[in-house]
Amino acid sequence: MKRIAIMIITTLCFGVSAHAGDPVAGEKVFKKCKSCHVVEKEKNKTGPHLVGLIGREAGSVESFKKYSKAMKASSIVWDAETLDGYLTNPKKYMKGTKMAFAGLKKEKDRQNIIAYFESLQ
């Protein structure tokens, strides 16, 4: 019983994504994003670099000048929850986004890529 209580408290404190995703699998999922984004260095491509993505305000990479008005005007801070929503269907989550990617339909893929982003912090 004590073990179950600890698991519940841990899940509530750290969120499901902290335990659900596999960063190694997430790195493989990220290959779908590499044509537009990088995570290794602060260099933009078609989309902004994703260095330091977790905890960053959306639309805040100063060197990236092609954000949509919707992205710049949003008050989103990227975390597991906001990334999951956005990566499910970017255009539905944020009307007016310029991101052409249709989204990651598989929940496991989203969990894994979020774990990958978290591992880069």
Question: What residues fall within each predicted segment?
Answer:
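Positively charged n-region of N-terminal signal peptides that target proteins for export
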Residues: 1-4
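Bacterial N-terminal signal peptides
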Residues: 7-15
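Electrostatic cytochrome c docking/interface patches
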Residues: 14-30
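Residue-level signal for beta-strand positions within conserved beta-sheet cores that form or flank
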Residues: 16, 46, 95-97
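Gly/Gly-Pro-rich "capping" loops immediately C-terminal to redox-active cysteine motifs
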Residues: 23, 27, 41-79, 103
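The canonical Cys-X-X-Cys-His
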Residues: 30-39, 113
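C-terminal capping alpha-helices of c-type cytochrome domains
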Residues: 77-121
